[in-house]
From Swiss-Prot:
GO terms for cellular component: ribonucleoprotein complex; ribosome. This is Large ribosomal subunit protein uL24. One of two assembly initiator proteins, it binds directly to the 5'-end of the 23S rRNA, where it nucleates assembly of the 50S subunit. HAMAP family: Ribosomal_uL24_B (MF_01326_B). The gene is rplX. Part of the 50S ribosomal subunit.
Length: 105
């Protein structure tokens, strides 16, 4: 079970986009995450009519290391660390370390 999952709202801790929030689009097996609107770079693409790719300058999100993001806690309006807790019914859930509040029900 991963501490950061697809669809989570995260905040960036370091780098050029420090303090920005975004939604996780994808968690990569290399320990990196793609976050919507974070670490956007411009790529120059050649047109490829066989694949239907138009040429030009394309803005694209690049992966960020998972250690550089923190799960956003709406109650405190800050990034928060995540831990795990086993509930009485045997389910393992993620909890915020600062408050003990369950992240996913």
């Amino acid at each position: 079970m991963s501490k950061i999952r697809k669809g989570d709202e995260v905040i960036l801790n370091t780098g050029k986009d420090k303090g920005k929030r975004g939604t996780v689009l994808r968690v990569l097996p290399t320990g990196q995450v793609l976050v919507e609107g974070i670490n956007v770079v411009k790529k120059h693409a050649k047109p490829n009519p066989m694949r239907g790719i138009a040429g030009g300058i394309i803005s694209k999100e690049m992966p960020v290391d998972i250690s550089n993001v923190a799960l956003f806690n709406r109650a405190t309006q800050k990034g928060d660390r995540v831990g795990f807790k086993t509930l009485d019914d045997g389910r393992k859930v993620r909890v915020f370390k600062s408050s003990g509040e369950v992240v996913d029900a």
